[in-house]
Amino acid sequence: MTLAKIELLKQLLRDNEAKTVLKQTTVDQYNIIRKFNTSRIERNPSLRMKWAMCSNFPLALTKGDMANRIPLEYKGIRLKTNAEDIGTKGQMCSIAAVTWWNTYGPIGDTEGFEKVYESFFLRKMRLDNATWGRITFGPVERVRKRVLLNPLTKEMPPDEASNVIMEILFPKEAGIPRESTWMHRELIKEKREKLKGTMITPIVLAYMLERELVARRRFLPVAGATSAEFIEMLHCLQGENWRQIYHPGGNKLTESRSQSMIVACRKIVRRSIVASNPLELAVEIANKTVIDTEPLKSCLAAIDGGDVACDIIRAALGLKIRQRQRFGRLELKRISGRGFKNDEEILIGNGTIQKIGIWDGEEEFHVRCGECRGILKKSKMRMEKLLINSAKKEDMKDLIILCMVFSQDTRMFQGVRGEINFLNRAGQLLSPMYQLQRYFLNRSNDLFDQWGYEEPPKASELHGINELMNASDYTLKGVVVTKNVIDDFSSTETEKVSITKNLSLIKRTGEVIMGANDVSELESQAQLMITYDTPKMWEMGTTKELVQNTYQWVLKNLVTLKAQFLLGKEDMFQWDAFEAFESIIPQKMAGQYSGFARAVLKQMRDQEVMKTDQFIKLLPFCFSPPKLRSNGEPYQFLRLMLKGGGENFIEVRKGSPLFSYNPQTEVLTICGRMMSLKGKIEDEERNRSMGNAVLAGFLVSGKYDPDLGDFKTIEELEKLKPGEKANILLYQGKPVKVVKRKRYSALSNDISQGIKRQRMTVESMGWALS
């Protein structure tokens, strides 16, 4: 096709002869005419692309040696033409040429490819190790849901990810890293090491890193599993009338951060609502909470979704939330209408009068409870219509009950037969609407009996539903089940909401969209470690979590605590951190443990035999007022028991699952987590043999003496007379000889002088508790 011919055809188009010319001209040449004669936007680009790809040679080759390697044909299949393309000046090739190139084309240097294209190779690994089941044919109910397209290494907001990528690839040009970037320093360090010396262009590296860090979510029709490992293979797993069973291989990459974030937020909300100022406490705790090594606020900003508790904490921290409304398990999104609230006194079925905020106005909502979705239409104190899809009976039942209660229908108020005085987890009385919600979820028959039944619509795609959640030829009034799919509603828009002192979220219109009472009562175990760096939160955790948090706090403030201890400040035992720890000590034993622990620590100080690991171990037990024997001496213990039984105990003289110490490596192991004491132990202590202060009233006088017989128990030691000797095991099980002191509080002059010198040194250092 020459330019002269194009000009001629242009003239022909203005003439009646154009029709004749066009009839004799091939389609691809006509396509070129249109290309040179119009600039209109293609109305159906997808169809145009499909149509173009059906031609013999739809693709253009660039000029050069690489293009010349593709043969004209392979096994009788034409791969390219000899003719020159007018647009690209190169040759045209078929789609088969792409397959030939991928199969038989040259392979360059692939060093470093697995590091760079890690996400692709992991996908291949999951595919290679996957388990494929049978294909089933038949109607597939697919629901549009917002899903993550591929698994991520670590999800973060796009702007944060771009800073992290700059820090990985161009550390010199990136400048001083922001705090939000430096939080990911472990990831940055790991990626720098991996990509070191890679000869791949930075733009490709940046693209692949973005794929690992930035979430790509789409609103896709899905049946079954929605985790990213399944969604990346969605095209192979289901269609409109077929499904393929598939289980991805390898380790699942789906993040545990999201699950741990939900657990943390639920606990923070539950702890905060019992405070005098819930909002203030929630903000304080949230700002001091870390998931793994990342602040909770960063997780909430990076990770999409979560549950009600996550949105409450987001709002408390000033972050935006997705547009939705909650009423317990019921999730709502307004379709149309507006309501106005007025307080009214309502006579309910049990004869009591309740003051309730009644919503006036016609409103329509998209509703969801678990996997059951529907459309609710309501007016003042009346549920007009509820259209739902088929799902699990439990979800259908809960959705219907919650919509009936949410609509504030008069029949619902009349259905109350018993008392409504439910409490939340904090022991507080719930508001009337939440009382009614709890009541009817427990006693659904009271509601359904009062509600009444009617004939279902005659339409073939609709059917009725009875009180047992079965399809029926009669239906609960206003409730209809559709055989068609109701798509999941997408909450893509975010909005800034205000939050009240009592953790209720309010839109600009004044509408309350969710509150602390909507937070799930479910208790879950976090998949990642959650650290609440505030004692106000620790008592909400398990015994092990409280032990871990308390000892972490002691380690963090060790220098200060040691200084206070050596200065003889007795009020040092009264920290909030130890008050929380007291809640896991059996009440009857708290005073005895305190007297024992204080006596041992005092003896260490008096004799200048500080053992840092023993100091850390016993310090939290000193909070309670000490309880001594009638003779003024402390009780003696080998094991300090904590609440919960099992492994919940601390061994005084050796290691235990909760607390153990390795003096060779100077590493403490708290609940399985290792913490180093390097740099926190003075040389004098490190070089000294085991200290004397193990048991109050006893001194270590030498090594194990076989002439003294077997190791004595605590009970046997107590029977010794002053000056008598015995063998015992101390610390991590070291055998030594001890002697019972003649005077419990005796101090020699040189020890007194030593303590004075030590105190002067500490005072000159100065200290402050972090």
From Swiss-Prot:
Where does the signal sequence lie? Answer: none
Give the GO terms filed under biological process for this record.
7-methylguanosine mRNA capping; cap snatching; DNA-templated transcription; symbiont-mediated suppression of host gene expression; symbiont-mediated suppression of host mRNA transcription via inhibition of RNA polymerase II activity; viral RNA genome replication
| Keyword tRNA processing among record annotations | no
One GO cellular-component annotation of the UniProt record comes to: virion component
Q: GO molecular function terms here? A: RNA binding; RNA-directed RNA polymerase activity
Give the location in the cell: Virion; Host nucleus
**What InterPro entries does this protein map onto?**
Flu_PB2_2nd, Flu_PB2_6th, Flu_PB2_C, Flu_PB2_CAP-bd, Flu_PB2_middle, Flu_PB2_N, INV_PB2, PB2_helical
Keywords annotated in UniProt: Cap snatching, Eukaryotic host gene expression shutoff by virus, Eukaryotic host transcription shutoff by virus, Host gene expression shutoff by virus, Host nucleus, Host-virus interaction, Inhibition of host RNA polymerase II by virus, mRNA capping, mRNA processing, Viral transcription, Virion
Question: Motif Nuclear localization signal, which positions?
Answer: 740-743
Outline what the protein does.
Plays an essential role in transcription initiation and cap-stealing mechanism, in which cellular capped pre-mRNAs are used to generate primers for viral transcription. Recognizes and binds a wide range of cap structures of target pre-RNAs which are subsequently cleaved after 10-13 nucleotides by the viral protein PA. Plays a role in the initiation of the viral genome replication and modulates the activity of the ribonucleoprotein (RNP) complex.
What family does the entry list?
A: Belongs to the influenza viruses PB2 family.
| Known partners and oligomeric status | Influenza RNA polymerase is composed of three subunits: PB1, PB2 and PA. Interacts (via N-terminus) with PB1 (via C-terminus). Interacts with nucleoprotein NP (via N-terminus).
Under HAMAP family, the record lists:
INV_PB2
Name the chain's protein: Polymerase basic protein 2
Gene that this polypeptide is encoded by:
PB2
